[in-house]
Amino acid sequence: KCRFHGVCLNMKKLFFVFLCLLISESYKVNAQKNSTKYSEDYYNATEWRNIGPFRGGRSAAVTGVAGKANLFYFGSTGGGVWRTTDAGNTWENISDGFFGGSVGSVAVSEWDNNVIYVGNGEKTVRGNVSSGDGIWKSVNAGKTWEPMGLKNARHIPRVRIHPKNPDIVFAGVMGDLYKSSEDRGVYKSTNGGKTWSKKLFANKDAGVVDLIIDPNNSRVLY
């Protein structure tokens, strides 16, 4: 039993504080010993890579190529344009670095398979829908791409190419999905997409979702 009660209590408090400080310092020393320092050169040497998920989103655009049974292209709403040369066993992206992910249509010229037109902006009307930035064209089977106008179209569900002249192209434009738009309608280019002229416009609330060229008469469109 302590004769000096106040002194005993203070000694206990001091001992407790000392013990806490000792444990804290011991933890800091061990943490410093176990921590590993990395040079900035280590991080500068690393490269970004895609580790998944390996999913490009839903697809509303796909096409084969006449005379080439194993060659196909598809456009996704969140992953750009993809190509397979082995009937779908493997796929490679051919649009990364050129344009955005949302694709509404893909068309390959029957006359020259190296010529590809892509209409950006998906056509699946839903709560979360991605718009695009017009028409893109490749003349080397997807190695490189160039923008070909119609940037305000937002959604291009269909592109059709003349069967014997890849410079004659038709584009069906849906336009803005949620408001009236003067950009809707059917457009035609006769110079490979350099310029476009509007050939059909019903009204600012009626967009185009599909186009068909008559296989027996390329002057007839539906």
Question: Can you annotate each of these PLM segments?
Answer:
Residues 1-34:
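Bacterial Sec-dependent N-terminal signal peptides
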